[in-house]
């Protein structure tokens, strides 16, 4: 049985991340759940929605991914996983989610480790070497002067 993945994030990030994952991994739609937290949402209401979304997975294999540690979605997620077997990781990004989807069949501990590594490895500096970014001959400033 696969672990399930619940994304709790500021709207519309959770749904957007899930949509991206479904674009690539459509077969896992039942295992990935998104909960968008609206700006005016009350934490108690969001927690109730999260409990409903998590269902029985809370004790049978749930990885919760949230966006910003200390923000409302993460605080709700912390309350959700407290006293359960679920794992929680803050700082969700697309590489983390893709890694989670690919390894959702592993143990929850292994899945959480892979998710965290995937998120961190997905962040890297990228050099700009495309031709349009290289220095080349410039036009004389007068080239752009036009009579009005």
What function would you assign to each model-found segment?
Residues 1-65, 69-148:
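N-terminal loops that bind phosphate or other acidic moieties
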């Amino acid at each position: 049985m696969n672990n399930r993945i619940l994304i709790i994030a500021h709207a519309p990030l959770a749904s957007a991340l899930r949509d991206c994952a479904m674009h690539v991994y459509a077969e896992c739609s039942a295992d990935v759940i998104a909960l968008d937290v609206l700006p005016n949402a009350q934490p108690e209401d969001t927690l109730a929605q999260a409990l409903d979304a998590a269902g029985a997975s809370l004790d049978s294999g749930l990885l919760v991914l949230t966006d910003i540690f200390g923000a409302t979605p993460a605080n709700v997620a912390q309350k959700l996983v407290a006293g359960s077997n679920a794992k929680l990781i803050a700082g969700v990004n697309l590489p983390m989610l893709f890694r989670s989807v690919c390894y959702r069949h592993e143990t929850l501990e292994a899945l959480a480790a892979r998710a965290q590594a995937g998120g961190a490895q997905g962040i890297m500096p990228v050099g700009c070497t495309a031709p349009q970014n290289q220095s080349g001959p410039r036009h004389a400033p007068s080239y752009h002067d036009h009579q009005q």
